[in-house]
């Protein structure tokens, strides 16, 4: 069983500054019974990678064509003469149509709201994804419901659509040693709800003087700044 995973363009498959998708894929690959048959493809400038089963797609800068389209085209070229059983795409539904020339099963993973993404915003686009993918995986029932909005009932029964909840390693927790601490971990942008968290946490900390909050993460593309004496923003860890 040979599996190729195409990361979102510019996603860093590196322990130095990984994206959420890279962290998820690295964790799953280490546990997979097919881990020796999996190859991850991406495009990053960072030298240190999570694993050796990674191929970096090198691109030349061009103002005349889409870097994303060029990225996917290079991936297709690498697979034209390969016998790959499954191609995995994460959070980039618009990549699927560019892969139709490859006679390979395609699995699409949604880690966020499908109707907010290029390639799955309209009912027509989502119907095409169902037609072209062997399986579409959601990380929650909510994201699956979002995907099915305005689609005929027949699509709601499709066996191609499946929910697989993300998980973490189970740790022993001593309930008696609870702290009055609220934590936010993730990208500090509105897509992840940090704008709502920030406004809410300021109200909570003002009302409950003995509570504290810790924020772990960053977001260079969107600046959402919240300040409070009991709020610590630690940045990317």
PLM-predicted stretches and their roles:
Residues 198, 211-225:
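Glycosyltransferase donor-sugar binding loop
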Residues 119, 131-160, 170:
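A short, active-site helix/loop in glycosyltransferases that binds the activated sugar's phosphate group
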Residues 222-237:
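Nucleotide-activated donor-binding/catalytic signature segment of Leloir-type glycosyltransferases, i.e.
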Residues 6-15, 24-67, 157-160, 219-221:
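N-terminal strand-loop element at the rim of the active site
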Residues 70, 112-132, 170:
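Nucleotide-sugar donor phosphate/pyrophosphate-binding loop at the beta->alpha transition
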Residues 114, 142-143, 160-172, 220:
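Short beta-strand->alpha-helix junction loop in the catalytic core
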Residues 4-6, 137, 174-192, 196-202, ...:
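Conserved donor-binding/catalytic core segment of Leloir-type glycosyltransferases
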Residues 89-95, 110:
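Short His-centered aromatic/hydrophobic patch
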